[in-house]
């Protein structure tokens, strides 16, 4: 189901709690909402649709990647950049890493570890910031 986008920083700044298999529908809602906003958005976190759970989706080269409880376990190549966010107005500066390795649960809630680089890594870092209540 396509959900409305939360645009209130006070709601976005609250850290999210771990997702469970009972939150699978939220993951599907994120996928649906990302597809509906594909012309203006490359990633979403659950708090952006009003759910304080650690769930993100990122538009990657092979298709949308859905992650439950993502954690960055390795990072290298810090750089400064600017980002926008569907939930916020304007562009803001932030620090990111060129390469990251993420531990997460996949759509079946099976544990996974995967490395990302470049823009895909940036999208995922932005989503994980949302999970941690960090607003760029």
Can you say where each PLM-predicted feature lies in the sequence?
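Positively charged
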Residues: 1-136
